[in-house]
Regions:
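Active-site groove signature of glycoside hydrolases
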Residues: 291, 305-341
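Acidic, contiguous N-terminal accessory segments
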Residues: 1-111, 132-142
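Substrate-binding groove of N-acetylhexosamine-processing glycoside hydrolases
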Residues: 1, 5-15, 19-22, 27-31, ...
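Short, Φ-rich (hydrophobic/aromatic) sequence segments
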Residues: 44-52, 117-127, 309, 342, ...
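A short acidic (Asp/Glu
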Residues: 45-46, 202-205, 267-268, 332-336, ...
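Short, well-ordered beta-to-alpha junction loops that form the rim of enzyme active sites
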Residues: 196, 260, 323-327, 375-377, ...
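Feature activates predominantly on carbohydrate-active enzymes
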Residues: 11, 15-21, 44, 87-304, ...
Length: 740
């Protein structure tokens, strides 16, 4: 493909299935273009005109016939028979196209209307890389491997429970439209919009459950202190959700609401704490705190609320609803009604029984054309008996799709078992949560494992390479779709690009080839090389890893304490400096696009944070070494302690000054947050005070938080290494896409 397109190759992502170069070139004039359209709907024709104007064509003229047009687009019976036959040979003809550039213009034949639009975005992507409008003569025949290519960005994420909002959750309508344009031009055809926590839309029947006037403490650089503000979701300030659903649908993009099945379901559990699942005295004595999200399904008020919620969401125009089971794995509601109904069952079987019951109830009230899906059965044991899967399959409404199937666990054998039990047509998503892990870890560069030490490479698994292997395995086994959980956009665009590439053309590129191509697609040739290099080398360290007295975070369990840890951190310091130099060079480039600048700037903030965390860890290790060696030079120990605290505070300053939502929240009665550096600072002070006295007195009132997503995932401490060692058998069954 790159040979056929030459210097234009990086402009296309996903790369086409087939491109053949011909002789000559065609020059398109930006001041005017004559267009002939046949067979498209009015909405599709409107998208054609909108895209051409966006591409810079000043005047659009309608040609009387195909031969008089600079650009001819046709679908249906007007497509020559030989081209229809060629498109029908592809996996999904209705989304496929043939684009021919030559003879003074371009012709697009679509297997369906959306296929024609994909041909158009391919043409315009090429033209965006041609300042003079000249393109090589080329013949492209192209179509997707997977019918549904989905990404899951966040509209809200644990809002009113663990977070107020960050990243995409703060976007207004125009920014969401720009993102939908990005998805359309990268041939993504569904968005699974995450709405966890207080609802980001009006809900007159339950106004207390929407994200309005939430009290949030945010940092003021001007006064150097926290201030309390009132936060209302952008869609409630200036509604845009229904408009962007229509806008996306016009571009062939389905919009799904991704919500909790019985947890984080709007603000009801916070506004009505009596409605929560109840913990037994035994569980309370054991220290359980995480009943703040789950609702008691035996209560009539809860059932009425949940039914009203799904009906309201459908009313907004969503094309489907994707429900997620609670991630709790150790207990189920202990109220008398639940004990009577489910007390004879293990906690997870009780949870699944309620899930089935709710899904049947939702099916009754939702329209037949509304897609219904579920993420469930995700808890240990990861490897489940076939009979267990078959039992739950038979209880599930046939209409319900699966938005979770196993990742690489058990060398993909568990995934292949799910394909056989549930059928590939029912599987729309696997466990592709690399960007979700990055968000859970507090917006750090958790992208590829190349930057991890060997001890963590043997543990880490939810990264970009893992996502790609899962996408390929889903394509190989004929699954209906693939889905990338894009919970973090800024600086993590590669996860979205991977979903676009591997859902469309799963075998065109190795992982390394994809990274090289995607980096240059995003930043151009010179800056793309810089970006690829820094992604391969930028260290990824969670704050808890530089503190030996805090519990291990489930996703990043190892500690960089001791001689080996200090040496690793010293190597990382040099890598962080090198990455920062590359980022400064990128940001100094004239004429960066808004997307390029926001990506580079977000990555720069992450790199600066990594440098400060690394330096804090280095000085803390040096302090421990001096102390443990029995050296009693108090002045030297104080210098090391001060340096460790300075760099830890610098990390916290970067967080507070560049992100909106950074302080722990106690709306649920439990301190919850995503940034652990205040705890690290307090633990450092405890260590220093033992030897150096009151000057380092810790804050006795410091909040010790639980992570918004980390509590139910402690089982990963056992399973992480097994998953990291797993072989992606479903993804290596042959580059021809052999079926399982």
């Amino acid at each position: 493909m790159s040979d056929a397109l030459g210097r234009y190759a990086y402009s296309l992502l996903p790369v086409p299935q087939r491109a053949v170069r011909a002789e000559g070139e065609v020059v398109f004039r930006r001041d005017s273009i004559t267009v002939y359209i046949e067979g498209l709907s009015a909405a599709e024709s409107g998208v054609v005109r909108s895209e051409l104007r966006e591409a810079g064509f000043e005047r659009l003229r309608t040609a009387p016939g195909r031969t008089e047009a600079d650009l001819a687009i046709a679908v249906g019976e007007s497509v020559p028979r030989i081209d229809r036959e060629r498109l029908n040979e592809l996996a999904h003809p209705e989304q496929s196209y043939r684009l021919t550039i030559g003879d003074g213009g371009a012709t697009i034949y679509g297997g369906g209307g959306i296929g024609a639009l994909y041909g158009l975005v391919t043409l315009l992507s090429l033209l965006r890389e041609s300042p003079d409008g000249a393109l090589p003569a080329v013949d492209i025949v192209d179509g997707p491997d997977a019918r549904k290519r989905i990404v899951s960005p966040t509209l809200t994420w644990y809002a009113g429970f663990a977070r107020a909002g960050f990243g995409t959750q703060l976007w207004e309508g125009p920014r969401w439209k720009a993102f939908i344009d990005w998805c359309f031009r990268h041939k993504i055809n569904a968005l699974n919009l995450v709405m966890y926590g207080f609802w980001p839309f009006e809900f007159p029947e339950y106004p207390e459950t929407v994200l309005r006037d939430l009290k949030v403490h945010t940092w003021s650089k001007e006064i150097g202190d926290w201030i309390e503000v009132s936060f209302t979701h952008p869609n409630l300030r200036k509604p845009f959700l229904e408009e962007i659903i229509r806008y996306a649908n016009d571009r062939g993009i389905d919009m799904y609401a991704y919500i909790g099945l019985n947890s984080y379901s709007g603000g009801y559990p916070v506004a009505h704490p009596e409605s929560r699942g109840q913990l037994s005295r035994e569980l309370l004595d054991q220290g359980h705190v995480n009943n703040y999200d789950s609702l008691c399904a035996s209560r009539k008020d809860v059932r009425d609320y949940l039914i009203a919620s799904v009906k309201r969401i459908e009313q907004l125009g969503f094309n489907g609803l994707v429900f997620e089971e609670s991630e709790e794995v150790q207990w189920f509601c202990q109220c008398e009604a639940c004990k009577e109904k489910y007390g004879h069952l293990p906690p997870n079987d009780a949870k699944h029984s309620v899930s089935v019951d709710l899904l049947w109830a939702y099916e009754e009230v939702l329209r037949p054309e509304t897609m219904i899906a579920v993420r469930w059965l995700r808890e240990p044991p990861i490897v489940k008996d076939r009979a267990v899967l078959e039992t739950w399959r038979d209880k599930l409404p046939e209409r319900v799709k699966l938005f979770w199937a196993p990742g690489l666990e058990d060398d993909d054998r568990e995934f292949l078992k799910w394909v056989e039990v549930f059928g590939p047509e029912r599987i729309w998503s696997r466990n592709c949560e690399g960007s979700g892990f990055a968000a859970s870890l507090g917006r750090i560069p958790y992208i590829i494992p190349d930057t991890f030490p060997e001890s963590l490479k043997n543990y880490a698994f939810q990264h970009l390479w893992n996502d790609i292997s899962q996408f390929q395995g889903a394509v190989n086994t004929g699954c209906e779709g693939i889905n990338g959980y894009g919970f973090e956009w800024y600086g993590h665009e590669l996860f979205f690009m991977a979903a676009a590439q591997y859902g469309w053309n799963a075998w065109a590129q190795t992982q390394g080839e994809f990274l090289a191509h995607a980096a240059r697609h995003l930043f151009g040739e010179a800056n793309g090389a810089r970006y690829e290099r820094l992604i391969r080398t930028l260290p990824c360290i969670h704050e808890t890893q530089i503190c030996d007295t805090l519990p291990s975070f489930p996703f990043m369990p190892n500690k960089y304490i001791g001689d080996e840890g200090r040496r690793y951190l010293e190597d990382c310091e040099m890598a962080a400096e090198s990455a920062l130099a590359d980022l400064e060079a990128i940001l100094a480039t004239p004429g960066l696009s808004a997307l390029q600048r926001e990506s580079a700037e977000a990555t720069r903030i992450m790199a600066l944070r990594m440098r400060e965390v690394i330096r804090a860890g280095i000085f803390f290790n040096r302090y421990l070494d001096e102390r443990d060696q029995g050296r009693n030079d108090a002045e030297r120990l104080e210098r090391l302690a001060d340096c460790a605290l300075y760099h830890a505070e610098e990390d916290y300053r970067l967080i507070k000054e560049h992100y909106f939502d950074t302080k722990e929240h106690c709306w649920t009665g439990v301190a919850i947050g995503e940034y652990y550096i205040p705890q690290v600072i307090n633990e450092y002070k405890k260590t220093f005070a033992e030897r150096l006295g009151e000057r380092y007195k810790p804050n006795e009132d410091a909040a010790y938080i639980v992570g918004g997503e980390s509590l139910p995932w402690e089982w990963l401490l056992e399973w992480g290494p097994k998953i990291a060692r797993a072989k992606p058998h479903a993804a290596i069954r042959g580059r021809e896409g052999a079926k399982a």
